[in-house]
Amino acid sequence: FNEQVFRSVPFREFAFPFTFAPKNKKEMLNVEKIIKLFKFHMLPEFSNKTKSAFLSPSEFQITYYYRGKTNDYIPQISRCVMTGMDVDYATEGTFHTFREDDRGAAPITTTMTCTFAETEIMTKETIAKGY
């Protein structure tokens, strides 16, 4: 006789990989800004000058769209926090760069994978609503 004990429902997690292949310096600088922006919003901040407590990191509302409209074929995702980020500067297996400038040599391709966790536990009721 086997018995299973129900303990909890884990928060759903989602990973989204984004590969960037900038064609020029302007696009390369935009990739750098995107990566810094996600890093910034992933982390908490101190709530006071004594640095004894944190404020929660930014929340994200992820929605799938197709041609400007919500894509109802893909389940909805409730509000999330970003729980991880991996940046791969050797997307093709080898590290390749543009010509160096005064800052160094920027990578030709970059893959940023962002991991998100929902802040709401899913139930049968939320799944029935399209989540």
What are these regions (language model features)?
Residues 1-131:
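Acidic, Ser/Thr- and Gly-enriched intrinsically disordered low-complexity segments
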